[in-house]
Amino acid sequence: MTVRPDIAGQDTPTTVENADITVVGGGGHVGIPLVLAFAEAGLRVNVNDLNQQSLDALKSGRLPFIEYGATDVLAKALANNRLVFSNGSDRISAGGPIVITIGTPVDEFLNPVRKVVQDCIDAMLPSLSDGQLLVLRSTVFPGTTDWLASYLATKGRKLKVAFCPERVVQGFGLKELREMPQIVSGATPQAERDAAALFEQITPEVVVVSPIEAEFAKLFNNAYRYIEFAATNEFYLIAKSAGVDYQRVLMAMKRNYPRAQSIPRPGFAAGPCLVKDTMQLIAFARNQFGLGHAALLVNEGLVLHVIDDLKHRFDLGTMAVGLLGMAFKADIDDVRASLSYKFKKVLSGQARAVYCTDPFVTTDPDLMPLGEVVAMSDLLILCTPHTAYRHADLNGKPVVDIWGHLEGANVIR
């Protein structure tokens, strides 16, 4: 690929036919930062997505979810005619690379579902040309990249298949694409070279490895992070069982001690990636990934431990409880796989009433303003440590904070 600075401020609109690159799932959490990064680099981008609501938002210059620093980049891309929006597998550009932000989800038996990728490829095949670069971007089960290359060969198609995993943090994808190395792999040497050339346009460094190494790198990164959360959560539970404030222990561990700086705070560790990717490794290892199993038990079980502790401290059946924060992490609006909702479900069978609030989430009609939740609740639980809660007026109500986010006489660790 060649960077296209010549089209800055171009009068000719980008079309499906003249786009330099197509991002399938371009209206999603993985796709939008990538779309904007390529547009910022001067490419004409076909933003392909089945979610018409997301496409309509982007067309109007609005982001469908929080992506910090992206609004101005989107406005510039629209003003410079860098983007075209398409819906459906028959609207894939026949020239230029195709980046697919659809991975292998986990089914109800905790097994990866490769058929999702296969169905996506099958739907697009009539629109693709031999020689095109096909890049898998989302997490896939180990072996999927080479499997896809073989699968396409059995169909008589000569496409270059690559796997270049996304590895950015939610809400800061565009920023991290500019700053962090991108892992690149290809099923053939030519696919590898083309994928590296593509991503060199938007990132300071590419790290070239084999497909299976890239697939493991993505899964290992996320599973390791999930295990880190499990370790600190178990430390929290051990300290609590001894009547010790874990936040003070954590402060002592980390104070000017470099080797402890990566230890995270305890809290509800979840989200759409960490749990799923750990499950993928468990499935790949034929259920022999002991640390992964243990991490799931600790992180998912933390909700039950907190509720059990509340039952010993309070007469929950007579109390209204307010949950502060429903997103899966701080200062974003994404509720996918958020443990706040597990907490709500379990607590609803224990407390007289449960009320929920979140300053960022707009997709849940049951959420209430913070002031109303505080006024109606006898007890508050900090589920997500949004920055805004640090200085919120909680009317002196008792608030359970396992994160160590709040200060005050009313805070219960």
How would you label these PLM feature ranges?
Residues T2-R413:
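Structural/interface elements that position substrates and couple domains in central-metabolism enzymes
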